[in-house]
């Protein structure tokens, strides 16, 4: 659920012209650390310059926690400030029982929501960003690592066993 709002914040900024898919963010040690933690990861490296588009695909396709932190830091300067933006957006769209404490959803008791609020958020994404919603149907993507070979990553979830997949996370 947290990664949905992380994506929505980026989509809002792209739509307003304040952010572009081509903009690149330098990967911090903080973001990189999550790629080494055993959590879902895009496997970004400290110092990599990664585009917003690739970070979004890393979040949407492979559920990359490191990509969430990199995007949050690139947009807001810190994950904490980004979480404030997320909670503010949640209230703006009618999510009355939700609070965000980080951009990835990694365990934190201050990161919570309700089924109703998650439905509101999911409907907001589908209604307001149908062109970006298509990313949620992708099975894999390839991105160019700074100074390294391109990396192809995929999503191996059961989503693709259904004839009409619908997945948001």
Each PLM stretch: what is its role?
Residues 13, 144-147, 164:
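Residue-level detector of alpha-helical segments with a strong bias toward transmembrane helices
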Residues 1-119, 126-127:
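Active-site-adjacent loops and short helices of periplasmic peptidoglycan-processing enzymes
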Residues 160-169:
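Single conserved hydrophobic/aromatic residue that forms the stacking wall/gate
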Residues 128-159:
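Conserved active-site loop region of the serine DD-peptidase/beta-lactamase
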Residues 70, 135, 168:
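Residues that scaffold the ATP/ADP-binding catalytic core of kinase and kinase-like folds
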């Amino acid at each position: 659920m947290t990664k949905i709002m992380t994506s929505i914040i980026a989509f809002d900024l792209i739509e307003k012209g304040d952010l572009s898919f081509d903009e690149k963010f330098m990967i911090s040690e903080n973001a990189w650390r999550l790629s080494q933690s055993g959590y879902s990861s895009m496997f970004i490296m400290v110092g990599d310059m990664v585009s917003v588009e690739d970070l979004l695909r890393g979040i949407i396709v492979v559920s990359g926690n490191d990509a969430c932190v990199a995007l949050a830091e690139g947009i807001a300067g810190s994950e904490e400030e980004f979480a404030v933006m997320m909670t503010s957006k949640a209230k703006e769209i009618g999510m009355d029982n939700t609070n965000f404490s980080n951009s990835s959803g990694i365990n934190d008791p201050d990161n919570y929501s309700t089924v109703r609020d998650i439905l509101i958020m999911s409907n907001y994404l589908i209604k307001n960003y149908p062109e970006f919603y298509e990313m949620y149907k992708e099975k894999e993507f390839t991105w160019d690592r700074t100074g390294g070979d391109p990396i192809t990553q995929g999503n191996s979830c059961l989503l693709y066993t259904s004839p009409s997949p619908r997945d948001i996370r």
